[in-house]
Every structure is written in structure tokens, then in C-alpha cells.
């Protein structure tokens, strides 16, 4: 219940971003470590190869970690047992692109347009708030997020974040 209330509050009253220079290689490695025990217990491989040419970006590291954790935990649930979650990061124009790909059950084509809508869920136990919060945080950072999925094959969530943020948060 506390998680639901916290997520709901983040949707209606976004928090102020605590911006700082962020090394994405370090942040991604750290966020993967946070879910590694859960993934290992389900025999899910976590794959990430650091990209030495990746620029630092201006971001809120806690909020960005929250985004990645939500994507990883959704991927772990979608896979269930025995699968792979791959994370890639690369330069893309004046920003960076981060992709999280899983070998899970995928998302039905008719559900893709609603995936970031508050209260929409594909899971019996889900609140439908997690991806809405993810979308909100990415937008606060001046970025975008997209999903590509094929039922039975898995999903890829792709974030694009600018190197230098144009503030979009309420206190900005």
C-alpha cells in the first residue's frame, strides 16, 4: 500500500530533480546489482557492457535508478524463469540512448499504446502506476521513452535522455 501511495503521489505532484553529473556506466552497473539476487534466483542473466565513450549527463541519479529498477523488475516478472535482460547505452545526437531488452512473454500489440497510462496493467497483481511514473520521470529529464514488443519474444524499452537537461519539473 505504501508503494502505491508513493507512486500515486509522484504522478500528481512530481518531486524536484536533484541534478548532478551522472556517469551512466556506473549508474547502470549499480542498478543491475540491486536486482541481481532476484534475477539469479530465477536463473535470469543480466547483461551490460560498459560504453567507454558515453558522456556524463545531467540527471537525478536516484530518479534515473528508479526508472531502471522499474524496467528491470517488470522484465524479471515478464520472464519468470530462465531468460536474459540486456541493457545497452550509447550516444545518440545531443543525448544518450538506454535500451532495456528482455526475453519475456512480450506485450500484446493492442496494449502497447496504453502501456504508460496510469492504472493500466497487464498483470493481475499490478497497480498500473510503475510505467506511468517511469514515463513521468523520463519526461522531467527532458527525455522520451518508447516500447517495442512482440508477444512470446520479449520487449525493449528505449529511453533517450539529453546530455544537458532543459528543466521540466515544477520547481524548475
Task: Pin down the residues of each PLM region.
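Short alpha-helical Gxxx[C/S/T] motif in the catalytic ATP-binding
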Residues: 130, 134
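Detector for a conserved hydrophobic position within an alpha-helical segment of the HATPase_c
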Residues: 137-139
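Short beta-strand/loop element within the Bergerat-fold HATPase_c
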Residues: 82-94
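Conserved catalytic submotifs in the C-terminal HATPase_c
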Residues: 20, 40, 45-55
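A conserved beta-strand-to-alpha-helix junction within the catalytic ATP-binding
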Residues: 18-32
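Conserved micro-motifs of the catalytic ATP-binding
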Residues: 15-17, 56-59, 122
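Short helix N-cap motif at coil->helix boundaries in the Bergerat
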Residues: 24, 106-114
Amino acid at each position: 500500500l505504501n508503494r502505491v501511495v508513493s507512486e500515486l503521489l509522484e504522478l500528481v505532484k512530481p518531486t524536484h530533480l536533484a541534478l548532478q553529473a551522472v556517469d551512466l556506466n556506473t549508474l547502470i552497473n549499480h542498478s543491475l546489482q540491486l536486482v541481481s539476487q532476484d534475477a539469479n534466483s530465477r536463473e535470469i542473466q543480466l547483461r551490460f557492457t560498459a560504453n567507454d565513450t558515453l558522456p556524463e549527463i545531467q540527471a537525478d541519479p536516484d530518479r534515473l535508478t528508479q526508472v531502471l529498477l522499474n524496467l528491470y523488475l517488470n522484465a524479471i516478472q515478464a520472464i519468470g524463469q530462465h531468460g536474459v535482460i540486456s541493457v545497452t547505452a550509447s550516444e545518440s545526437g545531443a543525448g544518450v540512448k538506454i535500451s532495456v531488452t528482455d526475453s519475456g512473454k512480450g506485450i500484446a500489440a493492442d496494449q502497447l499504446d496504453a502501456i504508460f497510462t496510469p492504472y493500466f496493467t497487464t498483470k493481475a497483481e499490478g497497480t498500473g502506476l510503475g510505467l506511468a511514473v517511469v514515463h513521468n520521470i523520463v519526461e522531467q529529464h527532458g527525455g522520451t521513452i518508447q516500447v517495442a514488443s512482440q508477444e512470446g519474444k520479449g520487449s525493449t524499452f528505449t529511453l533517450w535522455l539529453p546530455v544537458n537537461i532543459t528543466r521540466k519539473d515544477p520547481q524548475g
